Amino acid sequence: MLRVFSLAFVALSMCYGQASAQVALQVRFAPGTKSTSETDVKTHQILTLAGMDVETRSSTFSITTKTIGERAADGTLPIQEKIDVLQTEVGLPGGNTLQFDSSNPEKKAGNPLLEPLLERLRVSFQNPVTVILDDKNKIKEIKLPEGVLESLDASNKSLFDPVKRKKAAEQARGYLPDEPVKPGESWERATEADFGGGQTMSFRTKYTYVGTVEIDGQMFDKITGNVFEVSYSVDQAAPIQVAKSDLKVTESNETVLFDRGLGAVQQLQRKLRIEGPLTLVINGTNLDGKLDLTIEEKTKRQK
């Protein structure tokens, strides 16, 4: 009886140990390697002002290759991020559309007022970004090709600012937990999104480690995310100001499949919907309105 009890206790201990085992989820950078991923982003926005709906839609498909260089003597590591394919279509009020296709990047906008938007896409496609990591794999700086910033107009310059790019790059991988986690454990992150024109949205997201899942014979670590707080702000120098806003997250779901062996994201899928009233100040006049914004994103590692 004692032997049976001992075996049962050992089995129970093993099961408990497996259930509570912690895993470390860390991004890895193997010098001299390449990886390619494709991303599909869709947005739908309805901004209601003075009783009129202003609706815009956009869809962007991109294929990006990351090339990891070799460690320098000081321990720094360069990673070049190059967009191989970029296709964007924007539906604007009044039935107007804006299209960009990297197979014909120099094609001009039908409406000259929209040319700055196309120029932003051209610059993104034609200029690889280099991320420099330090000896501890923290982002040290972001480098753009020489002369890129100087060539941009004021409306686009902030989107390519190396300091802002560094912050965005840190956020892009900052959702991973700082410490080893076990299934069911959660953590929170605060992030910002720069929409250009001095507009910034700030988010708070709760992430949860679900555990391992098997897909096509391969094991991945699954993480889910839920945005639970959002705020909207505009720089004081912007032509349009926000007097007040009460935006809420009405729909949020995010799923990440992480390849622990490679130390890389295999797949990311998220959807976020934001709704609520806001008051804009345009030419000194307060305009009450409401915002309904939906953002969907799918990213998958190809190789």
What are these model-predicted stretches?
Residues 19-303:
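Signature of exported/secreted
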